Amino acid sequence: MKKLFIIGGTMGIGKSTVSQILKQKLPNSVFLDGDWCWDSSPFQVTTETKEMVMKNICAVLNNFLTCSAYENVIFCWVMHEQCIIDKIISCLNTANSRMIAVSLICSEQELTQRLQKDVRAGIRTSDVIERSVQRIPLYQKLNTIKVDTSGKSAAEVAEEIAAL
């Protein structure tokens, strides 16, 4: 039976890093970051682009799920509302798959420190800090397994998720 890991969390919490480590750790794994499905310049969030990104995500994930080469499908994206997770799941062919939905969480202080490091490195702009911190409480409301990343390395978090 395949495993489908759906990994959500606010911006800067470590979804992509953890997912990349998980991909290397688990056998026959493939990884999709939802951000890759609408990586554009300028980045535009409209009704049309939101519909497009969902179609792109579902198409790629379904291709991974039906490909016999893969045992572990790893998907990460911000997914701060249950309706986003539900919409993605509803369009997937999950027969013969076990779905593991995870939300990465951490303290406000730790998230701020991580994001400030990214801002200093030029990876993110400073406005992301406030937006990301404001979303932290939204993840507690989701029907997902919560994995607290506070004080843990990305490898430790990946190990915890792999054990689920």
What are these regions (language model features)?
Residues 117-160:
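Small-molecule kinase domains that catalyze NTP-dependent phosphoryl transfer to phosphate-bearing small molecules
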Residues 52-96:
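Glycine-rich phosphate-binding loop used to anchor ATP phosphates in small-molecule kinases
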Residues 1-4, 69-71:
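Pre-Walker A (Motif I) flank of P-loop NTPase domains
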Residues 95-115, 147:
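Conserved phosphate-donor/acceptor-positioning beta-strand/loop module used by diverse small-molecule
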Residues 13:
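ATP-binding Walker
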